Amino acid sequence: MKAYNQTIEKKFYEQYSVTEYCSSTLAGDKKEVTVLGYEIEIPPERNPVRITYYESGWGKEYREKKSELQDKKEFYIENTRGRSSHQYHPFCIIECEDGVIMLLAIAWSGNWYLKITEDGRILTGQTKEMFARVLKAGEVFYSPSVIKAQTEDGNLDSLINHMHGFGRDIWLKHNSESRCLWTEWNHWWTFEDSQINEEVFLSNARAAAELGIELCTLDAGWFGNNRDITWSKLQGDWSHYNRERFHHGIRYLSDAVHKDGMKFGIWMEPEAMGALSELRKEHPEWEALRDGKSYENPYVCLGNKEAEEWLFQAMSSLAEETACDHMKLDFNLDPELGCNREDHGHQKNDGLQAHYEGYYRVLKRLSEKFPHLVIENCSSGGLRTDYGIMKRAHTAFISDVDVSSHSLNCFWHLSMFLPPENILHWAWSQTLEYEDGSHVFESFLIDDKTEESRIKYTIRAAMLHQLGMSRDLTKLSKSCKSLIKEELDFYKIHIRPLLGKGEFYHILRTDGIFAFLIKDREKGYLFLYNTSNIAHQPKLVLKGYNNGHKYRIENIDTGSVQELTGNQLMEQGFLADTIAGETAAIYIVHLVDAL
């Protein structure tokens, strides 16, 4: 037998036009073998001519880039921060000759590279610097998967809906509760950790109940024994509830929220190890080190089996003691190449691989123990969103920054790869004003002076996925509460039932204008957003309609009505009402009859 055998395995999901690829390396039966990285080749049906990919950073997710491939130069990008989406997102669109289009999604939360060679070969994996592992005789290593969706007719929207169907039916995680898409209030941007306490949380929870909000989430600031130490320094002390801020404990908050008919959510950063935490003092042997040195932001290496078991028990205890329905899991640091300690149980050059393998196991066990718990994936916003972690978490938080123009741009791109019901983001937040008068990002304050159209714009910008908000609900006037409740009710009654069931189309993105369509056979909702300061009157060409039917298009705000055939909607389109800056319009598209 050879020293080792390396093969590319693939599984074809014909109904969705999707193929899953992975690499397997089997050591021979005589001696051990060292795997120095791995590489998966994705064979294109035609020669690649263009790639669309996305740069990323905090508050700068989904910065679209395009590269022409006809000049026969090699294309190469890599992610080395240790989080799948920090430098680049692990998603891309590859256009080939003769109308062939591919969507690629890397199912891994750590480092990766993507290469398109001069002769058109598509290669992805990890370099030997990113990953190396010694296999014992007879041992096998399976690489993380890569997902490819492909169409040969050039119809990107059809391909996106196939990708959504594959994610929805085969790959992505869901349970009955995650499909409810609860509307959420989270205290973070308005109060952060410095201003949150028991009374602030409960008073806002009561206001949330009046608005019909269904989930109240307690973010950072609830753990550790000291009010004056920044939350990030105490992470890992998950069993120490901050009694200075929350006199009655966290279960008291949960019970109060449940009594008001809502769900309770709680935030944690499972992998983090606060620099001043009791965890770090008591278990220095679990800390990830690189070349014997601590990380600037320490973390627990889950390549250590004892640490992995501790984390599962800590998360289980938190879920049990707080009776939470939703757990927001964050990760705010870059492990880069990962831990290379040799006393953890993992090998010197596979620490990050072992860490994520351990984290995936923890999430799997947590869901098995708490099958109704909804798990939210967050990492400084959207810096670790990939098909690997989304096989183990129910929803992905788009970005820490939720200014509506940024949210819509991020959603435009992410919703090409993830179904809308697996995405969560907040309407533009009211951010905390710091002592120097600054804000983490521009705040959107709602009061009686705020234009009604701008309030609707910010809420509607969060309607095409799970909708949340972060603001002081107790300070809203009666008229503002009424408007917000009306918008939330519209979302819950009309839009949410289509998420996960309807077809989804990207209609228009130009000059600050975004338009999306979600529809079933009988009715569709067309969302038109103007994020600029200039009024526009765009022509909207729709998709997914029947040529032989007549449709009525009605603006829910102005009442304006047009009637057009399916052929007219998809060939000529219709002229929308003029839309002012920072405004959102919703059109209902009704089926009238067959011609």
Task: Tell me what each language-model feature is.
Residues 133-152, 582-590:
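Short Pro-Gly-centered flexible turn/kink motifs
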